[in-house]
Amino acid sequence: MALITTGRGMIRDLEKSGSLAVYPPLEGGFEGRYQRRLRASGYVSESITARGLGDLAMYLTGVHGVRPPHLGKKTVGNGPAVGYVYYVPPIVNYKLEHLPPKAKGLVLWIMEGQILSSQEIEYLTVLPKSEPRVKVIVEMGGDRFFRWTPLQNTLVPA
């Protein structure tokens, strides 16, 4: 890999396809450099991990209920003793509403994406088509150098 990389190729491919699968080196460091280049080109970056997301569509674009660990505390009354449900706003819609006026859009950077199912990856490829200001980057594993491919190419035909 070159010592000085502008990241223009990745940004151009991201704008063209809407979603990318990236394979950064396992020793780390490259993700932060490319996120910094995305922010310098006008995007707002949001990093999340794929572990524990649950229903991806509801977590990203719908109001969803969250029940935190009860730690011995139970609800009072006649309901089930499993704790209260707190409702959380959707991450993507909330971030889009609060984008700076000059921002190009929102880049959703998802770490540990190799655990996502093919249905969830397919949803992530459709998300930028339904909301053009959202771009998706999913880390799909490691490689010896930083490389990327359109996320659509990682889907295996059934």
From Swiss-Prot:
InterPro entries to which the protein is assigned, alphabetical: NAD(P)H-quinone_OxRdtase_su_N
Protein name: NAD(P)H-quinone oxidoreductase subunit N
Subcellular location: Cellular thylakoid membrane
HAMAP family: NDH1_NDH1N
Catalytic reaction equation(s): a plastoquinone + NADH + (n+1) H(+)(in) = a plastoquinol + NAD(+) + n H(+)(out); a plastoquinone + NADPH + (n+1) H(+)(in) = a plastoquinol + NADP(+) + n H(+)(out)
Membrane topology: Peripheral membrane protein
GO terms of molecular function: oxidoreductase activity, acting on NAD(P)H, quinone or similar compound as acceptor; quinone binding
Cited Pfam families: NdhN
Function summary: NDH-1 shuttles electrons from an unknown electron donor, via FMN and iron-sulfur (Fe-S) centers, to quinones in the respiratory and/or the photosynthetic chain. The immediate electron acceptor for the enzyme in this species is believed to be plastoquinone. Couples the redox reaction to proton translocation, and thus conserves the redox energy in a proton gradient. Cyanobacterial NDH-1 also plays a role in inorganic carbon-concentration.
Keywords: Membrane, NAD, NADP, Plastoquinone, Quinone, Thylakoid, Translocase, Transport
Family indicated by similarity: Belongs to the complex I NdhN subunit family.
Oligomer and partners: NDH-1 can be composed of about 15 different subunits; different subcomplexes with different compositions have been identified which probably have different functions.
EC id: 7.1.1.-
GO cellular component labels: plasma membrane-derived thylakoid membrane
Source domain of life: Bacteria
